[in-house]
């Protein structure tokens, strides 16, 4: 068997997320069907992360096995051809060792969350960023973010449906940068809880609106209660950027 590692980008707006589900179209299903069309083999695609409906990806990584060797550049061309008309594409493919696993071999995952912060919405960024018309206090958000860095119990920021065995995670990066009318939040960790990034963003926005003081983020974290945190930020602003191995 030959194991292939692919890097994928997609717009999640019209998709049901990464994972295959009955009755709806997912990224996993689109790619598995595309691979079958050119290889004749039913494969199971393993992704490095399971993005929700509406979440985008710039560098999602996945792997699959084929019984015969195909040149990686031909695999890229074939997948992109058969994945049409969906906004899903592969931009890298390479052979990987048989012990490589897109999910379990990962050492870190990187996300970006985009906020358009101006009085009027952006047509160009429709469904690709969270539009917030009220001015946000970015320095206050940056101050609050410091409390979340490091190893913590992130129960307050996990979805009620989260299936992770432990709420303990290590947030290695949480940078907030404002560029003109756009605010970007950069987050990285070895792994994340379900909705963890979006719940963190939703809480930091309350700080940015001066509804919360920066120090309240520490109280939310220590509460270990989802009800203590802010709302879940929209999926449209979230991008799965890359996975490190």
UniProtKB/Swiss-Prot annotation:
Catalytic residues (positions): 52 (nucleophile)
Keyword match Iron-sulfur: no
SUPFAM superfamilies: Pseudouridine synthase
HAMAP family, per the entry: TruA
Stated role: Formation of pseudouridine at positions 38, 39 and 40 in the anticodon stem and loop of transfer RNAs.
Keywords from the UniProt entry: Isomerase, tRNA processing
Lineage, top ranks: Bacteria, Pseudomonadati, Pseudomonadota, Alphaproteobacteria, Rickettsiales
Family: Belongs to the tRNA pseudouridine synthase TruA family.
A GO molecular function held by the record: RNA binding
EC assignment: 5.4.99.12
GO biological process: tRNA pseudouridine synthesis
Superkingdom of source: Bacteria
Catalysis performed (reactions): uridine(38/39/40) in tRNA = pseudouridine(38/39/40) in tRNA
Gene symbol of the encoding locus: truA
The name this protein goes by in its record: tRNA pseudouridine synthase A
A Pfam family that the UniProt record links to this protein: PseudoU_synth_1
InterPro entries linked: PsdUridine_synth_cat_dom_sf (IPR020103), PsdUridine_synth_TruA (IPR001406), PsdUridine_synth_TruA_a/b_dom (IPR020097), PsdUridine_synth_TruA_C (IPR020095), TruA/RsuA/RluB/E/F_N (IPR020094)
Quaternary data: Homodimer.
Binding residue positions for substrate: 111
């Amino acid at each position: 068997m030959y194991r292939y590692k692919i890097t994928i980008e997609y717009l999640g707006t019209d998709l049901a997320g990464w994972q295959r589900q009955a009755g709806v179209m997912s990224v996993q299903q689109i790619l598995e069907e595309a691979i079958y069309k050119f290889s004749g083999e039913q494969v199971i695609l393993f992704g490095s992360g399971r993005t929700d409906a509406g979440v985008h990806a710039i560098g999602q990584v996945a792997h699959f096995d084929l019984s015969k060797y195909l040149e990686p550049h031909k695999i890229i061309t074939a997948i992109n051809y058969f994945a049409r008309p969906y906004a899903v594409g592969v931009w890298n493919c390479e052979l990987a060792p048989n012990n490589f696993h897109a999910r379990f071999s990962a050492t870190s995952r990187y996300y970006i969350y985009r906020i358009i912060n101006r009085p009027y919405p952006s047509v160009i960024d429709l469904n690709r960023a969270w539009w917030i018309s009220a001015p946000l206090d970015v320095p206050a958000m940056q101050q609050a973010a410091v409390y979340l860095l490091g190893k913590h119990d992130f129960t307050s920021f996990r979805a009620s449906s989260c299936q992770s065995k432990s709420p303990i995670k290590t947030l290695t990066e949480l940078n907030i940068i404002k560029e003109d009318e756009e605010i970007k939040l950069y987050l990285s960790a070895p792994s994340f809880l379900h909705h963890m990034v979006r719940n963190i963003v939703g809480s930091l926005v309350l700080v940015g609106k001066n509804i919360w003081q920066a120090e309240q983020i520490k109280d939310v974290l220590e509460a270990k209660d989802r009800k203590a945190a802010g709302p879940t930020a929209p999926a449209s602003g979230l991008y799965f950027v890359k996975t490190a191995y």
